[in-house]
Amino acid sequence: MKDLSKYAGIIPAFYACYDEKGDISPKAVRELTQYYIDKGVKGLYVGGSSGECIYQTVPERKLLLENVMKVAKGKLTIIAHVACNGTRESMELAAHAESLGVDAIASIPPIYFHLPDAAIAKYWNDISSAAPNTDFIIYNIPQLAGVALNPSLLATMLENPRCIGVKNSSMPVEDIEKWIHCGAKVVFNGPDEQLLGGLVSGATGAIGGTYGAMPEVYLKIFELAKSGKDLDKARELQQDACQIIYKMCSGKGNMYAMIKEILRLRGAPDIGGVRAPLYPLQPGDEAIAASCAADIDAAIAQFCC
């Protein structure tokens, strides 16, 4: 029987860490990993959207994961997103991830061409076959991938004993209930703005792109939701988190550029900027980041101490 409790908790999506030349910084990767260990998160989701994976080469993605694992192995649950445009490269990353001892691999569906469900299932199962001793998680993010998971496709995938569930980043909370009803053993809430709703609907844990900027806030929401002792407080804290997210997105630069500045302001390691074509911080964005950092600290002081 698999131990699925390791997936129950707050799992920040790990950010790309670059040096002054824009190359992967192994040192910054290790430092950021330790930062999250010290914050008390359950795990890390490495190589996903928040990690700018689609703008990185296969060797770069390997290097980043290797340095996460140097620090995190045995301390955090590590889920490695391994999808590439092609099946061959995705399988290469899957095999590499398993060799490092990750807890699970994950994959979006094939992008650009709209493929039938049978082709999507084959893509996922081929990737899973390259990591035969590792859990597999479907990443459902239709607003970016261009294709949505459906009950029939999930049923097909659950015939693969390694497929344990879904990282669900579609917006309806209803989808979380749907995948649970379909037999998924593990379902992660994806949209950060609906963490509380996702947990109340039965999500096992949560993976989010803004969790890394304010892990204390999301850890408290998770604690309150799972205990059921003070849902009013959880709801108020979720509303604060949403307002901070909206402010993060109000700048001219990409949200992840904003988050990296917020991390610096909050004492986290300097992990560089974002990789083009993602838009870097623009004049005026630093003030927004400072305001977000102040709001995060205020929420922590009010709810998390």
Segment roles from a protein language model:
Residues 93, 100, 188, 293-296:
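A short, hydrophobic/aromatic-rich structural module that often spans a beta strand
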Residues 2-148, 263:
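Active-site beta->alpha loop and helix N-cap motifs at the rims of alpha/beta catalytic domains
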Residues 129-134, 141-242, 248, 252:
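Catalytic alpha/beta core domains of metabolic enzymes, predominantly
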Residues 6-17, 39, 200-203, 210-305:
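C-terminal alpha-helical cap/extension of soluble enzyme domains
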